From Swiss-Prot:
UniProt entry tagged with the keyword Hydrolase: yes
Active site residues according to the UniProt entry: 99, 233
GO molecular function: hydrolase activity
Region (Thioesterase): 26-249
Family membership: Belongs to the thioesterase family.
General function of this protein: Involved in the biosynthesis of 12- and 14-membered ring macrolactone antibiotics such as methymycin, neomethymycin, narbomycin and pikromycin. Responsible for removing mis-formed acyl moieties (aberrant decarboxylation) that are bound to the PKS and could block it. Catalyzes the cleavage of methylmalonyl-[acp]. It exhibits some acyl-group specificity, and catalyzes the cleavage of propionyl and butyryl derivatives faster than acetyl malonyl or methylmalonyl derivatives.
Name of the coding gene: pikAV
Name recorded for this polypeptide: Thioesterase PikA5
Annotated knockout phenotype: Cells lacking this gene produce less than 5% of methymycin, neomethymycin and pikromycin.
Length: 281
């Protein structure tokens, strides 16, 4: 790869549901496998007014369904770096990713720090085991019936879509491509990030147990904290307000902003005991 970002159309990749040109910081939001930018509409609405969400639309879905999907985390990250260049050239950019999006956010942050000398304001990784752990099992290689059973198990997709053959025909290719990207991603050890990292997870997530999410602490030399919420892999769906408050507070505190609502990173619950996970080294 060259040091120069790809030439991509930011308008295709980035959706600004609540534009805030004078925001203190912008948070790039990267969706899960099969997800889209619209998943973050509520997220964008609930964030602190000084934090603007830039929601990423991967190719191969919704208004980009005619485009081929990208099937690797690294390729997705390269395109996100290029699409967000107008904002990271200004500074004041942070990243949030859920599941597949967490891996893409991590790789994007690594490219910015190591190739472009840009330190993100923060990295927020949700519902994803640390990249240094063993790869996921290869769900994307299952037949349709077994693949859909796995989708149902995670409870993140409206059952009406899974029972509609026409809709399935439209969304299955993107789902499989995204799962392939997530499951074939191999972490290549390199210098740690220096930006603050906050890991978020549901306390009953079968794909991202809390002890494995906590291993994200090994991937930054900067501040780290872990926040657990009640729920499974898609714990976000019922707790947008609390999650947005926690992220806004953490982001504004780590930036030293005077209008943050709290002065400490949030506390997480692990195995029933309250523990703080800031710089646990």
């Amino acid at each position: 790869m060259t040091d120069r970002p790809l030439n991509v159309d930011s308008g295709l990749w980035i959706r600004r549901f609540h534009p805030a040109p004078n925001s203190a910081v912008r948070l790039v939001c990267l969706p899960h496998a099969g997800g889209s930018a619209s998943y973050f509409f509520r997220f964008s609405e609930e964030l602190h007014p000084s934090v603007e969400a830039l929601s990423v639309q991967y190719p191969g879905r919704q208004d980009r369904r005619a485009e081929p999907c990208l099937e690797s985390v690294e390729e997705l990250a390269e395109h996100v770096v290029a699409a967000t260049e107008p904002w990271w050239q200004e500074g004041r950019l942070a990243f949030f990713g859920h599941s597949l999006g967490a891996s893409v956010a991590f790789e994007t942050a690594r490219i910015l720090e190591q190739r472009h000398g840009v330190r993100p304001e923060g990295l927020y990784v949700s519902g994803r085991r640390a990249p240094s752990l063993a790869p996921d099992r290869l769900v994307h290689q299952l037949d349709d019936r077994a693949f859909l059973a796995e989708i149902r198990r995670l409870s993140g997709t409206d059952e009406r879509f899974l029972q509609d053959d026409e809709l399935l025909r439209l969304v299955l290719p993107a789902l499989r491509s995204d799962y392939k990207a997530a499951e074939t991603y191999l972490h290549r050890p390199s210098a740690k990030l220096t930006c603050p990292v906050m890991a978020l997870a549901g306390d009953r997530d079968p794909k991202a147990p809390l002890n494995e999410v906590a291993e994200w602490r090994r991937h930054t030399s900067g501040p780290f904290c872990l926040r657990a919420y009640s729920g499974g892999h898609f714990y976000l769906n019922d707790q947008w307000h609390e999650i947005c408050n926690d992220i806004s507070d953490h982001l504004l505190v780590t930036r030293g902003a005077p209008d943050a609502r709290v002065v400490q990173p949030p506390t997480s619950l692990i195995e029933g005991a309250a523990k703080r996970w800031q710089n646990p080294r």
